[in-house]
Each structure stands twice: as structure tokens, then as C-alpha cells.
Swiss-Prot record:
Keyword Transmembrane helix: no
Organism: Danio rerio
Annotated Basic and acidic residues bias: 570-580
Record lineage: Eukaryota, Metazoa, Chordata, Craniata, Vertebrata
Main localization (coarse): endoplasmic reticulum
Gene name for this UniProt entry: colgalt1
UniProt name for this protein: Procollagen galactosyltransferase 1
Catalysed reaction equations from the record: (5R)-5-hydroxy-L-lysyl-[collagen] + UDP-alpha-D-galactose = (5R)-5-O-(beta-D-galactosyl)-5-hydroxy-L-lysyl-[collagen] + UDP + H(+)
Residues carrying a glycan: N78, N166, N363, N561
Length: 604
């Protein structure tokens, strides 16, 4: 009996001995995301805020671990209304929202315009940033993120990625249309910007990583868990500060005195921002400069959508004073079509899509039915090959437009292809150019707005009394051009289908600037009046060797023999390369420059 009881006791106690209590516990849960306060200090930012706020909406970070601190003042646009609507609609998503609007006054005392930074403005902005930083400290935030109100954060994981760098002050490198970015690699003994050899390799991402630099600005992340962060301040300036009264320099000095190193990270593309304008620029200039940043995003990325928590009016498109705007697109290149339609819409430009003739789909009987004959003796100048089917389709696409211009009696038309990027202030600069052409009663047939200048040894002749216009010399590409009714008539009158060559070789023949006399001899009437914008208003999205470069003209087959393919080593093709460097003697230095042109070419 005792043995039986002992046996049952073993059975009852055995399982308990085989399990430790901790083995029955669930695994430890993940840590909560660090608490982040995002600060926005905005003025006259109505043009940029819908997209900047949309980018913040889309950050891949739990909203309940984020606080939003927003201040705005001295506005002459509807910045306050936009921010208020957004905050009302998103406030329940965030852990905390602080809103500091100031409706009056709309200008600072002593400022000459909305882009003029007076000492009073610097001081006010620094005080607001300091207030935001103190709020973050009071609520025990782990991180403080400052974002300027025209900075587009396209990388949704930017917060996580900056946190992983484990730096007290770290900034994501932002892209711009120029060499400008949100960091300095050098600083003078007086605190000003200093050019250094280290800058461009980082800016171009030839060197990738997180680099110690003396200055970061615009968008940056502070790790408030670091002990040294307690000594950082946007305002007041450090007692030892004697440099210029400038917000970013004052903060950089604060970091230096706190022995905190600033870092810039360029491991990935994190976002975009516009190049700063001059103090005399207008709000319209600023809006169009920001618009250009949006367009640059779309060259290689999906468009930046505005915040869904804002009610926005649709844009009103127009034809910029032309009778028609033609946009050529291959039906199978839907990605290009969608990008171009969006970029045109953002610029409020209406267009008519012209379905391009697909050279690959042309057969011998179709070519024969059109009466197409090759120009005797033509061969590609770089490969020695005849015309490709892609080049044939390209020519026919432009040829069909010239026919439509004549049939409809269109006095002036803009023709653009689908693989281009627009220069800053594109619409205004083109409209200004055409107004000057009209007011000066220029006798013109065709005006390039995008091309590759092939004559690089001597300057082109500037057009008197017209800003930014030269007489066109030998050029490649038909990215974009303005053409008159008379110009289209001249091109058709030459009967080019009977002596076919690529369209960008045909045009220089028709304005008598082709270097090969034999080609020109087949076209006795070469009186096309051709000019070019200078500087150019559009450029290709990609060049030979670029990631994503696709050529529908070079990568094809010979026009009359599908078995002969033409996909040679495109690295050898000069035709699709970027514009060669012009010699100093060839620079069009006597061309009248408009203020917009000089602004567009600045690289700060």
C-alpha cells in the first residue's frame, strides 16, 4: 500500500519538477518605438505644405509615438488655413499636437520682401525652434526632428534609419537641382561656408555613409537621450558667439561648444528640397522653385502626393498661348506617358497626346505604301549604319504633327517628346521668350527649347533685343521645339519621306547648318528660320549609361531589314550622351540673360 501511494505521488509531482516557472511565460514583447517630436515652423508655405504634410503622413512610424509642434506667422498666403485644416484632421492620430499661429502682422519690420531675412526674422524663428525643443524635453521625448516647410521626405523609413545611426545630431542628405544640399563640409574661422574637396563626392554619393561635418540644416534629428543634447540650443546664441546672426550658424556653434559632432547621411535618397532664392525673389518664384523639386522627384520616383487630409482645388491648365501643345508618346511606354501627363498637370499645362508611330511594328509593305525612300548615302555618323526602324517611327511621329499643324492652320505649336525633364521656371520662361519674339516681330519658323548642340567650337549668334535666344547651329535631338505654321509647311514641302534621314538630322539640313554637304544637296530649298533658347528649357531625363536609360531609336533594327539589329554598345554612342563641354570661345556670352535664367543657373 505504501509503495502504491509513493508511485502515485511520483506521478503527481513528476510534471511539476520537469517545468521551471519561466518556461511557461510568454516571450518578452518588443520595445515601443521611441517618442519623437516633429517641429514645423512655417511662413508663406501654402505652395509646398500639401506635399510636405503628405510626406509626413506617409512616414513609416507609429503616429501614437509622435508629437507634432507647429508654428506659423507673418503670412501673406493661406499657410495658416492649410495647417489648421491638417491639424484638425490628424490630431487624433498623434500623441500630442501643439499649434501656435499668429495672424498679424504679415511682414517683419524693415524687410524688403518675403524672401528677405532680417535679424528680427532670424531671432523670431530661432525662438520658435527653441520653444519646440523645450517642449520636446518637457514631454520626455526621445528624439526631436526639425523639418523645414519645403523639405520633401520621400523615404518613408527616414526616421528609423536616422535613429539607427546613433548620433546626437544627424541629418538626411537632401537632393536639389544643383550642387546645393543641407550640409557643409567646411567652415571658415568666421563661421561662413568654405568650399572643400570633400563636398562633391558626398553630394554625388560617390562616397556613401554617415559623415562628420561642421554644419547640417533644414531637416535634422536630435537624440535627446544623449547627455550632451541638454547643452544644445537654437536660442539664445552661446555667450561666446561672435559670428554672423544666422540661425543655422548659431546652432552649429552651439553644437561645437557642446562638443557634439554633426553628421550627414547619404546612404540612400531621403528627400528633396529647392535651392534657396535671393532676397529679391517673390513668392511666385519660390512656388515655382518648389514645383521644380516636385518634378525632379518624378524623374525617377513616383510623384509626391499631397496630404489626403487637405481639401485642394484642382489645377487649371492652359496651352501657354500656343494653338496646341503636342506630346509624343509610344503606346507601350505608359510609364513615360503617365509621368509626362502628371508633370504637365503640375505646371498647369494642357496637352494633346500624339500616339507615336512604333517603328518596331512597321512592316515592309507599310513602309512601301508611304513611299519612304532612304536618303542616298546616309549612314549614322557614329555607327556607320543606315536608318533604324525606331528612327523611322520617330520621324513619322513628328511628320504627322507637321501635317496636323497645316491641316488645322495652327499658327504656333509646341512639340515635346516624353523623355524630358523641365528646367526651373519653365512655363514662365517660355512664355516670356515667346512674348519677346512676338513684340520684336522676329521672323521665325522653329525654336528649339531642348537639344544637343553639336557645334562646340564657336559661339552661336545671339538674337538682338531678345533675352535667351540664339540662331541655332548644328544640333541633335528633338526633345522639344516651337514650330510655326510656315515652318511646318516648309518641312512638308521638302518631301522628306522620299529622302529619309533621322528627324534631328533633317532639321539642321533644312536650316542649312548640317556639316555634310552631300545630305543638304538633296534639299535645294533650305530656308527654315531656326533658333534656340539659350539656356535651354528642357533636358533628357536620362543619358547613355544612366540607370533606366532606354532608346527606342538606337535599340531597334535597320529600317528595311528586320534581321539586322542595331543594339550596338551604346556606351560608344555620342549621340545620346550628355552635352559635350563647350570651349570658352564657343560660349554664348553675348546672349541677353533674364533674371529668371540667372536664378535658374545658380549653384549655391
Amino acid at each position: 500500500m505504501h509503495l502504491l501511494c509513493f508511485f502515485f505521488l511520483l506521478l503527481w509531482t513528476g510534471p511539476a519538477r520537469s517545468y521551471f516557472p519561466e518556461e511557461r511565460w510568454s516571450p518578452e514583447s518588443a520595445l515601443l518605438a521611441p517618442r519623437v517630436l516633429v517641429a514645423l515652423v512655417c511662413r508663406n508655405s501654402a505652395h509646398s505644405l500639401p506635399h510636405v504634410l503628405g510626406a509626413i503622413d506617409r512616414l513609416n512610424y507609429p503616429k501614437d509615438r509622435m508629437a507634432v509642434w507647429v508654428a506659423t506667422d507673418h503670412n501673406s498666403d493661406n499657410t495658416t488655413e492649410i495647417l489648421r485644416e491638417w491639424l484638425v484632421n490628424v490630431q487624433n492620430f498623434y500623441h500630442y499636437v501643439e499649434w501656435r499661429p499668429q495672424d498679424e502682422p504679415s511682414v517683419y519690420e524693415g524687410e524688403s520682401g518675403p524672401k528677405h531675412w532680417t535679424n528680427l526674422r532670424y531671432e523670431h524663428v530661432m525662438k520658435l525652434r527653441q520653444a519646440a525643443l523645450e517642449t520636446a524635453r518637457e514631454m520626455w521625448a526621445d528624439y526631436f526632428m526639425l523639418v523645414d516647410c519645403d523639405n520633401l521626405l520621400t523615404n518613408r523609413d527616414v526616421l528609423w534609419k536616422l535613429m539607427r545611426e546613433n548620433k546626437t545630431i544627424v541629418a538626411p542628405m537632401l537632393e536639389s537641382r544643383a550642387a546645393y544640399s543641407n550640409f557643409w563640409c567646411g567652415m571658415t574661422s568666421q563661421g561662413y561656408y568654405k568650399r572643400t574637396p570633400a563636398y562633391m563626392p558626398i553630394r554625388r554619393q560617390e562616397r556613401k555613409g554617415c559623415f562628420a561635418v561642421p554644419m547640417v540644416h533644414s531637416t535634422l534629428l536630435l537624440d535627446l537621450r544623449k547627455e550632451a543634447s541638454r547643452q544644445l540650443a537654437f536660442f539664445p546664441p552661446h555667450p561666446d558667439y561672435t559670428w554672423a546672426f544666422d540661425d543655422i550658424i548659431i546652432f552649429a556653434f552651439s553644437a561645437r561648444m557642446a562638443e557634439v559632432q554633426m553628421y550627414i547621411c547619404n546612404r540612400e535618397t531621403y528627400g528633396y528640397f529647392p535651392v534657396p532664392l535671393r532676397s529679391q525673389n517673390s513668392l511666385q518664384d519660390e512656388a515655382e522653385s518648389f514645383l521644380h523639386s516636385q518634378l525632379e522627384v518624378m524623374v525617377r520616383n513616383p510623384p509626391i502626393e499631397p496630404s489626403v487630409y487637405l481639401s485642394l482645388m484642382p489645377k487649371q491648365t492652359d496651352k501657354m498661348g500656343f494653338d496646341e501643345v503636342f506630346m509624343i508618346n509610344l503606346l507601350r511606354r505608359s510609364d513615360r506617358r503617365e509621368r509626362m501627363l502628371r508633370t504637365l498637370y503640375e505646371q498647369e499645362i494642357a496637352c494633346k497626346i500624339i500616339t507615336a508611330v512604333d517603328g518596331k511594328a512597321l512592316n515592309a509593305s507599310q513602309v512601301e505604301a508611304l513611299g519612304i525612300k532612304m536618303l542616298p548615302g546616309y549612314s549614322d555618323p557614329y555607327h556607320g549604319r543606315p536608318l533604324t526602324k525606331g528612327e523611322l517611327g520617330c520621324f513619322l511621329s513628328h511628320y504627322n504633327i507637321w501635317n496636323e499643324i497645316v491641316d488645322r492652320g495652327l499658327q504656333s505649336s509646341l512639340v515635346i517628346e516624353d523623355d524630358l525633364r523641365f528646367e526651373v521656371f519653365f512655363k514662365r520662361r517660355l512664355q516670356n521668350l515667346m512674348q519677346e519674339v512676338q513684340s520684336q516681330q522676329l521672323d521665325w519658323d522653329l525654336i528649339y527649347i531642348g537639344r544637343k548642340r553639336m557645334q562646340v567650337e564657336r559661339p552661336e549668334k545671339s538674337v538682338p533685343r531678345i533675352h535667351s535666344l540664339v540662331e541655332a547651329d548644328y544640333s541633335y535631338w528633338t526633345l522639344g521645339y516651337v514650330i510655326s505654321l510656315r515652318g511646318a509647311q516648309k518641312l512638308l514641302r521638302a518631301e522628306p519621306l522620299k529622302k529619309m534621314l533621322p528627324v534631328d538630322e533633317f532639321l539642321p539640313v533644312m536650316y542649312n547648318k548640317h556639316p555634310i554637304e552631300e545630305y543638304m544637296s538633296h534639299f535645294p530649298q533650305r530656308d527654315l528660320r531656326a533658333f534656340s533658347a539659350e539656356p535651354l528649357l528642357i533636358y533628357p531625363t536620362h543619358y547613355t549609361g544612366d540607370q533606366g536609360y532606354i532608346s527606342d531609336t538606337e535599340t531597334s533594327s535597320v529600317w528595311d531589314n528586320e534581321s539586322v539589329l542595331t543594339d550596338w554598345d551604346r556606351a560608344r554612342s555620342r549621340k545620346s550622351r550628355e552635352q559635350e563641354e563647350l570651349s570658352s570661345e564657343a560660349q554664348n556670352t553675348d546672349v541677353l540673360q533674364s533674371p529668371l535664367d540667372s536664378t535658374a543657373r545658380d549653384e549655391l
